[in-house]
């Protein structure tokens, strides 16, 4: 399930950026915007599903060492998903969106950093830190 989660995040971030830049200079969405946005929504559902699955698996093992950090990552991840959607909708409507875009990018970086340092992440695997 971890591989599905990582794959969904990578594709989701790419789709978010491509959807964000798929507007004309006048601010109208291009033809490719709607399919890109719908595909992004599909991947956002996959991200949420695989993330919740991982949280349930972690809490079921009850090791207790990383529950607070995992909960913080879960909250950040839900925030990223919400900000992605709100940013694109506000841009489509012509409302201010640049602050939301940069806030989304910042929260993506924080969420990815939390995912890297959690057990099962690359840093934990590199130094053989087990649960």
Curated annotation (Swiss-Prot):
The keyword Lipid metabolism does not apply. Belongs to the UPF0344 family. It is a multi-pass membrane protein. InterPro entries: UPF0344 (IPR010899). The keyword Transmembrane helix applies. Its main location: membrane. It comes from the Bacteria. Pfam families: DUF1516. One of its GO terms (cellular component) is plasma membrane. The lineage of its organism: Bacteria, Bacillati, Bacillota, Bacilli, Bacillales. Keywords: Cell membrane, Membrane, Transmembrane, Transmembrane helix. It is found in: Cell membrane. It comes from Staphylococcus carnosus (strain TM300). The chain crosses the membrane at residues 1-21, 42-62, 69-89, 99-119. This is UPF0344 protein Sca_0577.
């Amino acid at each position: 399930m971890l591989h599905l989660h990582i794959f969904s995040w990578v594709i989701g971030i790419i789709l978010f950026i491509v959807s964000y830049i798929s507007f004309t200079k006048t601010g109208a969405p291009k033809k490719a915007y709607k399919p890109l946005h719908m595909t992004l929504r599909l991947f956002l559902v996959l991200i949420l599903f695989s993330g919740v699955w991982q949280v349930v698996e972690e809490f079921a093992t009850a090791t207790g060492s990383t529950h607070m950090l995992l909960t913080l990552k879960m909250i950040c991840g839900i925030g990223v998903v919400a900000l992605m959607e709100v940013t694109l909708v506000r841009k489509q409507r012509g409302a201010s969106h640049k602050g939301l875009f940069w806030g989304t990018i910042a929260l993506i970086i924080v969420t990815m950093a939390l995912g890297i340092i959690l057990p099962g992440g690359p840093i934990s695997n590199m130094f053989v830190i087990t649960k």
